Amino acid sequence: MIMKRLVSLFVLLAALTFESLACTSAIVAPQRSSEGVPLLWKHRDNARYTNTRIEYISDGRYAYTAVVPNTEKYDKGVYAGVNEKGLGVISTATKNLPEATPEEYKACTLSRMSGGVMWNALRKCATIDELEELLKKTKRSRRSHSNFGVGDASGAVAYFEVWDLGYRRYDVSTSGNNGFDVRSNFSHAGDPKKLGSSKRRYDLIMKEMAEHKGNFAPQNFIDYSRSYNSIKYGNVLDDDSYYYCSNHTVPRASTVGVFVVVCDGKCPRMLVMNGHSVSSIAVPVYVQAGSNIPECVHGDAMRLLSNDFREKAYTSVNKKKLLNKEVVRSVLRIKQPKMDMPKETPVDIHAFNANIDKLFAKHEKRVRKVLSKF
């Protein structure tokens, strides 16, 4: 009886908080990548856990650079990352995969949630196949309902739809999508009657990527993360009404970060926004640079600017989600600083990062000037 109540409580809490855990993602094969290696994109939404930073960690077989909670422990909270071997991993929450029974639930441990799976993968695995072996070994000890996007230096790239007692692998090479694939907050292996409202974001990105000519560059995904396009309403910023349905667009009130992982064995790297995609800038970080990470994403500056933007741009009245579109339009009009991401770690990484922080400081000043008018 106690176990049944525990499971019921967990399901209820999951239902209540799922909206805040939603994300949008895509993976790209080497032949469609401007970098010649797999790309992984995660647009992270999480209204509860917004306090993150970019960190270099060497607590296992392989060192890695990852998005982690602003704490001293990472075993439950890696949100995206890439290790020194070029293995990259991202995830999105999913709600239509099989649930464990009360009896099976006893064998699952909360320490194996999606953040823990990614933490273990980055520190222990060099290839997709090694990550798959990790999933097999943790089959009866994990508590995870996630879509994991994974790429490695060999060029292999796939989604793993993972639940407590099983998983299914979807290689991009067999997806039929011309070198890419997309996931939001449902799984193809799950119940087709429970796709949820995130299907709108899935359809949007599938459409925009299908229409894209040529290869995909990391900046293309930053653009997707800053676009208020929707399938049903077009660009919602073109309508002056305050009301909008947040699940129709990629950026939302709950947006807390954007990460494009480059699975390059010679120079593993990421393009990151540690904050809302509208108010932030995209910053390159390199695993080979170790702990030399731009302070604007290693510290609090970008995240705090994001919080201030969110307060001005989003609100809710009588359960209706409202968007101050003039705030969003005004911030989007601010020209993003030109930010190159070299395919080799810069020789003078200190000067490289110092310039990034200088550019962000100027950007932050411009954004705050705009926000002060509202």
Question: What are the functions of these language-model segments?
Answer:
Residues 1-4:
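N-terminal secretory signal peptides that target proteins for export/translocation
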Residues 6-16:
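Sec-dependent N-terminal signal peptides
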Residues 17-22:
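Sec/Tat signal peptide C-region and signal peptidase I cleavage site
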Residues 24-87, 91-123, 143-146, 152-374:
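C-terminal, well-structured catalytic/ligand-binding subdomain of enzymes
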Residues 127-136, 239-245:
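Charged, amphipathic alpha-helical segments
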Residues 130-150:
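Secretory/export targeting leaders with adjacent low-complexity proregions
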